[in-house]
Amino acid sequence: MNEIQTHIHGVSIRRNFVENLPYNPQLKKLLPGKRKARILSEVLFWQQVRARTFHNIDFDRQRIIGNYIVDFYVKTLGLIIEIDGSSHDEKEVYDGIRQTYLESLGLKVFRIIDFDVKHNLTLVMKELENYIISNYGI
């Protein structure tokens, strides 16, 4: 049975709750600093999704999953949203390892470029809608 989470443009979106995710409590002490860092692209994105303003979907900010802190997490969809800054080869390798691990838990990862959030947020939100529809729509 597919429990409906919400609707986007008339398309029913099914829940995909991933249970028993690993959690490293040692990372909890890092959360206040990350939240206070106020990275502009994260603040702009958060303004679009906080308090269920994006299709009544509940987003968490700075969520610990395993040994990682993800930018945003939608528990009911098992969806991670990561905002990527400027690319460096080392960062890309790290992001790839991290994404492989997160996907091995049954999660999906939607990546956004920092520049796009700052300069074309409307398009970013449309791309997120399309991603959710294509991955969770029924």
For the regions a language model picked out, list residue spans one by one:
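Solvent-exposed, charged helical/coil patches
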Residues: 1-56, 135-138
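Basic, amphipathic alpha-helical patches used to engage nucleic acids or provide basic targeting signals
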Residues: 34-38, 61-131
